[in-house]
Regions:
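N-terminal and secondary-structure boundary signal
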Residues: 2-335, 339-341, 345-358, 363, ...
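Cysteine-rich micro-motifs
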Residues: 366, 370
């Protein structure tokens, strides 16, 4: 066993016969009020943190897109959580890695995450090579071993997923959100071995003490980054990730049968007997993702190729294709409509990617945040890729 390896027994309990409380509170009277209410229903803040204790916060910041797009966790919610933990005398630390097709530094800078953490009294955890530990997953069906951040093995975790659909997994809520605590090697393996079973295996290993699903603005359609924003105005919380996720599915109008990793989790861990408290969950039917079989096969194949491509090139294969503008959701300037007004340049966090003289986008520099699409008054910037040619408006 290597210096960065350890064996770990599964900590996921069998939940059959246990009553799991799931709380849903509307945010229309303020996110702070909703946050305090859900936590109070679950036993209060002292149930989840103690003075002097380090608490790992795991938001969903999968890509450089703001929370009002439905793609990422609200920074307002994250800041409030940091504040509450600081008030208890705890030490909140933020841990997140983006999707493999996005560069870590660019994503962090898009959210100004280092400054955000510092200004709110939290620590942004480094993700250097010595921060990862290889762990054996006892009982793992397909994912037998995972490289996870050392902090999640040493401290309690509060999980902050987003209420949204996902073109590969159907939905991404609490259980899926834990992929962000994994090294890219493990993320790749999960896609190659089978994403749904792998998510279940990862949740055998890592069990947050609290799951807070951010449903202020959700996402429907071809999520989890470039779907359609959907205003919901709800926080859903539970100590049990599966119970919280099933409540999220209920709100989204999605059956557990449509989300294989949650179905498998129910079979493995038992479907929790839930006690629902707070505001009534009124079904708000989300548009389902619509991937073709060819898309799903191609997406998985990307990760198979990446296992050889990345060691040779030092860049992930899907990121390489996106940077070349070969695949992926991306902005496109319609030369017949563009009037070179410059509004896109003013809002773009990477303006060097826009060439208004030639009306082109340099995808090697583009973050694919699509801020330019919203800023373009004449609607000259379109969206190309699997999400279809459409506007964000």
């Amino acid at each position: 066993m290597g210096p960065n390896e350890e064996s770990r027994d599964p900590v996921q309990e069998k939940r059959q016969g246990m009553k799991e409380k799931v709380v849903s509170i509307r945010t229309e009277k303020g996110v702070a009020r909703a946050l305090d209410a859900v936590v109070e229903h679950l036993g209060g803040w002292k149930s989840f943190a103690s003075r002097g204790e380090t608490i790992v916060l795991k938001p969903n910041l999968v890509a450089p897109r703001h929370s009002d797009t439905g793609a990422t966790t609200s920074l307002e919610l994250l800041a409030l959580l940091v504040e509450r933990l600081r008030d208890l005398g705890a030490y909140p630390v933020i841990l997140e890695t983006p999707g493999m097709e996005y560069r870590l530094e660019e994503t962090w800078q898009f959210f100004d995450l280092p400054a955000f953490a510092s200004s709110h009294g939290a620590e942004l955890l480094s993700v250097n090579s010595n921060d990862w530990v290889s762990v054996q997953i006892a009982g793992g069906k397909v994912l037998k071993r995972a490289r996870v951040h050392r902090a999640v093995l040493e401290h309690r975790i509060i999980n902050l997923p987003k209420l949204k659909t996902h073109i590969i997994t159907g939905a991404t809520l609490s259980m899926k959100n834990l992929m962000g605590i994994c090294h890219d090697d493990t993320k790749r393996s999960m896609h190659v071995l089978g994403i749904h079973r792998s998510i279940v295996d990862l949740n055998r290993l890592i069990v947050p003490v609290l799951n807070l699903i951010d449903g202020t603005v959700g996402m429907e359609g071809d999520g989890a980054v470039y779907g359609v924003p959907k205003k919901v105005g709800m926080l859903i919380a539970g100590k049990n990730a599966l119970a919280a996720d099933l409540a999220g599915l209920e709100l989204m109008g999605i059956s557990i049968e449509e989300i294989p990793h949650l179905k498998f989790a129910g079979e493995e861990f038992g479907v929790p007997d839930t006690e629902k408290v707070g505001d009534v969950l009124v079904q708000d039917q989300f548009l389902a993702p619509r991937p073709s079989k060819a898309y799903l096969l191609g997406y998985r194949l990307l990760y198979v190729i990446d296992s050889c491509f990345y060691p040779l090139k030092g860049i992930h294969f899907n990121e390489y294709l996106y940077r070349k503008g070969i695949v992926g959701t991306r902005p496109y300037i319609n030369k017949d409509v563009c009037n070179s007004c410059g509004d896109c340049l003013a809002i773009c966090p990477a303006p060097q990617c826009l060439d208004l003289d030639h009306k082109t986008v340099n995808m090697a520099e583009c973050l694919r945040c699509l801020e330019c699409v919203d800023a373009c008054a004449p609607k000259a910037i379109e969206i190309r890729g699997v999400s279809g040619n459409r506007s964000c408006s």
